Curated annotation (Swiss-Prot):
Keywords: DNA replication, DNA-binding, DNA-directed DNA polymerase, Nucleotidyltransferase, Transferase. GO terms for biological process: DNA-templated DNA replication. Pfam families: DNA_pol_B, DNA_pol_B_exo1. Belongs to the DNA polymerase type-B family. This is DNA polymerase 3. Its EC number is 2.7.7.7. It catalyses: DNA(n) + a 2'-deoxyribonucleoside 5'-triphosphate = DNA(n+1) + diphosphate. It comes from Saccharolobus solfataricus (strain ATCC 35092 / DSM 1617 / JCM 11322 / P2). It is an enzyme of class 2 (transferase). One of its GO terms (molecular function) is nucleotide binding. SUPFAM superfamilies: DNA/RNA polymerases (SSF56672), Ribonuclease H-like (SSF53098).
Amino acid sequence: MIKDFFILDFSYEIKGNTPLVYIWSVDDEGNSSVVIDNNFRPYFYIIYEGNENEIIENIKKNCEALQITKVKRKYLGNIVDALLIQTSTPTQIKKCREKISELNNIKGIFDADIRYTMRYSLDFDLRPFTWFRAEVNEVKFDGFRTKKAYILDKILSHYEGNMPELRTIGVDFQIYSKYGSLNPRKDPIVVMSLWSKEGPMQFSLDEGIDDLKIIRRFVDYILNYDPDIIFVYDSDLLPWKYITERASSLGVKIDIGRKIGSEVSVGTYGHYSISGRLNVDLTGLLVNERSLGHVDLIDVSNYLGISPSRYSFKWYEISRYWDNEKNRRIIREYSIENARSIYLLGNYLLSTYSELVKIVGLPLDKLSVASWGNRIETSLIRTATKSGELIPIRMDNPNRPSKIKKNIIIQPKVGIYTDVYVLDISSVYSLVIRKFNIAPDTLVKEQCDDCYSSPISNYKFKREPSGLYKTFLDELSNVRDSNKIKVIEELISSFNDYVHWVNARWYSREIASAFDEFSNEIIRFIIDLIKSSGLDVILANDLLIFVTGGSRDKVNELITKINSLYNLDVKVKIFYKSLLVLDNNRYAGLSEGDKIDIARKGEEDMNLCELARNIKRKIIEEILISKDVKKAIKLVKSTVIKLRRGEFDNEELITWAKIERDLNEYNNQLPFVTAARKAIQSGYLISKDSKIGYVIVKGLGPLNDRAEPFFLVKEKNRIDIEYYVDQIFRETLKLLKPLGVNEESLKKTNITDILDLFGASKKK
């Protein structure tokens, strides 16, 4: 029979030394389906020199190859002889690759680290969230939970079409833990909430059951509802890791996939994979969302206009509320409202990211954890495969920076500004690649009379034919669907970072340098044009130019001129009513909708206590709204006075750290490592992927020796207040010093400051 299928995901398993490809999909009648292909074998390529027959014989001696075939392929744009080596299973590729690399006359190994299901997707040009038509035979399989199962005979065609109605669900859960590190062996799940098209569903300990029954009810609900996509949201708690480990400690398996017996497991990209379903952590999508400076669920929901939960809790506060039976209702409501927000947010993002899935070709759950660099590289691999270009093996080097630091185009003008237009100049990078045909397969290292040459280093690039990068960008530019415009712009704007990513498959120092030389020349021309028109450039980075001093009409007129001169697509990305500039990559703006964007906030705040984080944000808000630095100074001084008077909660002074490897691999001088060791000595479970919260207590020893797990410090008088005072002064001075505030004036407290504090207290 001939059927059409909408693709969700791919997976495979080995049966009798034969790999079976599973195409998880929805058929044209709306049935959850699996299409099984048992005829596809893994392979990779080598290029060589010397006697071909001898090389083939040596390969056969060292590698269990099913078949070795001589083929023509491209290597950096040049036609070369290559050997296609086919193996029985994907795992054999790695063994063959290692042995072949030791043989003589092997010039290169290619395509050997392409995942098996990706290889399948590439060869048949099948992409998730698109359709394919195929000749299939319906079969009965006991091992699947899909409504239909088919054996593939032949793929006839593939095409884009309307997305069928997918069954989606949002999941939230809350854990009871009295201490500073979640322990799945002892800390129960007290509430598990789900939200779908059919409305809410919740299981809780308050119903007189234990969390073993909560987990079982959750599993039953997922199996009965049979969602295509499960949305979760939590970058801190690692939801599936906790659920699976908690279930394991209780003797339960989380078998909720569409392949019976396949438990939730860690996938290739580090995400948690559920066979036949897309398990999407929305945090992963939003971390890569350039327009958002934070990924807190409530903040994001507000930012995107989705009604968030009425409550806000830190995870370590749940136990305190749960211990009071009158407050349990609040926790239940908090969780169900979170599940609703997750469900709504997931469906909101689905409409945008489904288009990116089609372009890149990664399933949504994998896409959610893939960086923009990986997204671009996956797209380039597809483009290269179509042209017969060999795919280099990625050579990760942990001893060098992942990106080359780029030069600052102009020095930023530090200060507070009003009526700032932010120009998106990301189209410069696609222009440079298209205009000068920059690519790894067009780079010429010998004499070339008919090449483009970079302005400074004189690196040369063939004019014809179109290189890999230009071909890829031309494919994107041919898309006219308005729903895809945003994600295409994101891909293009990320190309600048990709070119400088030293662990990329096609990274080249020459390309990165030439790319900078060409693009900087154009950007400087744009800046000069802006200045000559009477406007002021206060900040410029790789993607944006911040302009002030003119009306919207004047800015639009200037943009039209720039675009016509260089065939660009420069546009106003955002208008800030006020903008605080601290340096080239540190700024904050207040938009017309009174939303505050803060650049580089997350990186700087990693090792700060909650109080310091909060005061920094309040200072930024004060400066942007009132534009009064004196008010910001008063805010710092009043915070310090309250701190010294003991007007704080211990929780405000907690610094959180995630333990990303075994403790014995860390430098013992780190405060959070000391705190973690002390927690273990006191009988608490602390392990890799745990979060540890610590405070600094009084004492004469070094700082790390005075770090204590926060749950072991109950008395305020044990805490080293002056350590936190210094932290607040140090961090707030980073914001205020560029605005003319010196350390002495910030730290000096006079009678007026104290009276102001008491006056504020009385007003309250």
